[in-house]
Amino acid sequence: MKKQGFPPVIDENTEILILGSLPGDVSIRKHQYYGHPGNDFWRLLGSIIGEDLQSINYQNRLEALKRNKIGLWDVFKAGKREGNEDTKIKDEEINQFSILKDMAPNLKLVLFNGKKSGEYEPILRAMGYETKILLSSSGANRRSLKSRKSGWAEAFKR
């Protein structure tokens, strides 16, 4: 089944962009980035910016990101995938990253949430951005939350 990604959550103040792969079924139903309750994205990011992002509604989460100059987007504009596993994404269409120069002129750091999105790291690095690949926030990631928190915190240091 073909799935459509979400528009970018970025503006002219965005300095850090986190790129996922493609929204999963629950996120698509909720119309929210990282909408699956088993995904640790909001917990991990909240620990970095010092806010409890899990206890606030989605719109307030996005506002917290903007206050912290953090944007969200996905590598893929669309793709076919059964279920939620990144390894099952096929026939993907890549987003047009060239728009970042105009939409987020202050963007400096692009973080890739997991291996699948990280496969596209060379493209963003070639555009002149600092890049880092994060351990996936997915609930399917078998690494401990503590290990992922440490890796994420290190990636945000500049």
Curated annotation (Swiss-Prot):
What InterPro entries is this protein classified in? Hypoxan-DNA_Glyclase (IPR026353), Uracil-DNA_glycosylase-like (IPR005122), Uracil-DNA_glycosylase-like_sf (IPR036895)
Q: Which domain of life is it from?
A: Archaea
Q: Which GO terms describe its biological process?
A: DNA repair
Please give the CDD domains that the UniProt record associates with this protein.
Answer: UDG-F6_HDG
Looking at its record, which EC class is this enzyme? hydrolase
Q: What is its EC number?
A: 3.2.2.-
Q: Which family does it belong to?
A: Belongs to the uracil-DNA glycosylase (UDG) superfamily. Type 6 (HDG) family.
Under which name does UniProt file this protein? Hypoxanthine DNA glycosylase
What organism, scientifically named, is this protein from?
Answer: Methanosarcina barkeri (strain Fusaro / DSM 804)
